[in-house]
């Protein structure tokens, strides 16, 4: 059974890994190196080479970059786009056939999972869609909601909007406090932004 992805955008939030994808016997025949990497992952013996063999949508290489596998159970850890998937995302940490990278293995073996995420072992609902999912992820775990902010600096357009908003707020504050002194008045925002374009 092929699992066609809804999106192939790097780090797009995806939670439905219910499609098991090609069977294990089919995976063994078609992708023996990938299956061997998954087996090593079962015993925490995966290597950096295994990480490359499995790959991801973001890597644009390896098993998990291929349409038929990208959103299968095997790729639930590397392609979910969720924070701390190895700690708190059931299709990843609750599935032995989901390949965990060497980094994810180290987080688990060194017990570096944030303690507040343990309540999310069984995710009842997952929030975030479209552009909003680029900003936050909601884990709704048995009526307890944890929101994790993603680094806005990874999104240049959102960063630009944030900078413009900050400049407008600063301008408003300065112009309202210095409004009584005509000599201290700031230029209008349109002039400020037109000067920014000259840089």
From Swiss-Prot:
Cell compartments where the protein resides: Virion membrane; Host membrane
Membrane-crossing segments per the record: 150-170
Positions glycosylated per UniProt: 131
Stated role: Essential for viral fusion with host endosomal membrane and core release. Not required for virus morphogenesis and egress. Induces complete autophagy through the interaction with and down-regulation of host PYCR2.
Protein name: Inner membrane protein E199L
Superkingdom to which the source organism belongs: Viruses
Subunit structure: Interacts with host PYCR2; this interaction results in autophagy activation.
Membrane topology of the entry: Single-pass membrane protein
Source organism phylogeny: Viruses, Varidnaviria, Bamfordvirae, Nucleocytoviricota, Pokkesviricetes
Similarity field: Belongs to the asfivirus E199L family.
PTM info: Contains intramolecular disulfide bonds.
Organism expressing this protein natively: African swine fever virus (isolate Tick/South Africa/Pretoriuskop Pr4/1996) (ASFV)
